[in-house]
Amino acid sequence: MRLNDLHPAEGSRPEGKRVGRGIGSGLGKTGGRGHKGQKSRSGGSVKPGFEGGQMPLQRRVPKFGFTSKLAMGTAEVRLAELAKVEGDVIDLASLKAANIVRRDMKRAKIVLQGEIDRAVTVRGVALTKGAREAVEKAGGKVEE
C-alpha cells in the first residue's frame, strides 16, 4: 500500500453538485435557485438579523446595564500573590513594584484565593471578609 493508492470507500463521499449542466441533471437552467428574487442573484443574500424591513429584534429590545468606571480602575489581587511582595507592608505602591497590579490601576482589592504564610501589614488596600480573616490569622494586621 502506498499513499497514492489510498482512497475513500465507495459511496462514503457524495459527488459534488454540477449546477447548470442541462435539465437531465436536475440542476440545470436555474441551478436549484428557483426563479427570480434576491436569493437567486449572484451575491444576493439578506444580512443576518434582517427581517424584511420590519424593526429587527436587536433594535426592538431595550439596551440595559453599563460598565462601572470604578471596576475598570480596580485590580483584583489573590491572597497567594502577596508572597511575591518584598517587605512586610503591602500597599498599592508595593503591589505595583512587584508587578502584581498594573501601573494604571487606582485601587486594589485582595480576595481570598490561596493562602498566606507570613505576617503582613495591609495598608490602603481593600480586602474581602475572608481575606481579612486570613491575614489576621497569619499574624498580620489591616490598616485602613
Swiss-Prot record:
It holds the Pfam family Ribosomal_L27A. The keyword S-adenosyl-L-methionine does not apply. Residues 21-31 have a biased composition (Gly residues). InterPro entries: Ribosomal_uL15, Ribosomal_uL15/eL18, Ribosomal_uL15/eL18_sf, Ribosomal_uL15_bac-type, Ribosomal_uL15_CS. Keywords: Ribonucleoprotein, Ribosomal protein, RNA-binding, rRNA-binding. One of its GO terms (molecular function) is structural constituent of ribosome. Residues 1-58 are annotated as: Disordered. Residues 1-18 have a biased composition (Basic and acidic residues). GO terms for cellular component: cytosolic large ribosomal subunit. GO terms for biological process: translation. HAMAP family: Ribosomal_uL15 (MF_01341). Binds to the 23S rRNA. Part of the 50S ribosomal subunit. PANTHER family: 50S RIBOSOMAL PROTEIN L15, LARGE RIBOSOMAL SUBUNIT PROTEIN UL15M. Belongs to the universal ribosomal protein uL15 family. This is Large ribosomal subunit protein uL15. It comes from Alcanivorax borkumensis (strain ATCC 700651 / DSM 11573 / NCIMB 13689 / SK2). The lineage of its organism: Bacteria, Pseudomonadati, Pseudomonadota, Gammaproteobacteria, Oceanospirillales.
